[in-house]
Amino acid sequence: MSKMRAERVGEQMKKELMDIINNKVKDPRIGFITITDVQVTNDLSLAKVYLTVLGNEKEVDDTFKALEKAKGFIKSELGSRMRLRIVPELQFEYDHSIEYGNKIEKMIQDLHKKD
């Protein structure tokens, strides 16, 4: 499978996952999430879903537990929406890049304040 196709599938999967999680999954533990990236392996067997959660650490943990519990439902919904022979296995990962970017931005602002 080509890398470009895996990237296209990942982009489409990102859109579909946002819709499924926001509108179909009814678990109250799922907080306000943003899917930042979906990386699909070239053979389409695994999709790593990178996301951020607005809230404290407990809300982040609760959201990931709820997503793990709803993984089967999410995968079946994804399968009915996308034309794939095999729906990739979903692996949810917390994306630390937003926090890291905010930390760097704060450091830059602090440096400008000192000048």
UniProtKB/Swiss-Prot annotation:
It is found in: Cytoplasm. GO terms for cellular component: cytosol. GO terms for molecular function: ribosomal small subunit binding. GO terms for biological process: maturation of SSU-rRNA. Keywords: Cytoplasm, Ribosome biogenesis. It holds the Pfam family RBFA. Monomer. Binds 30S ribosomal subunits, but not 50S ribosomal subunits or 70S ribosomes. Belongs to the RbfA family. One of several proteins that assist in the late maturation steps of the functional core of the 30S ribosomal subunit. Associates with free 30S ribosomal subunits (but not with 30S subunits that are part of 70S ribosomes or polysomes). Required for efficient processing of 16S rRNA. May interact with the 5'-terminal helix region of 16S rRNA. This is Ribosome-binding factor A. It comes from Staphylococcus carnosus (strain TM300). The lineage of its organism: Bacteria, Bacillati, Bacillota, Bacilli, Bacillales. The gene is rbfA.
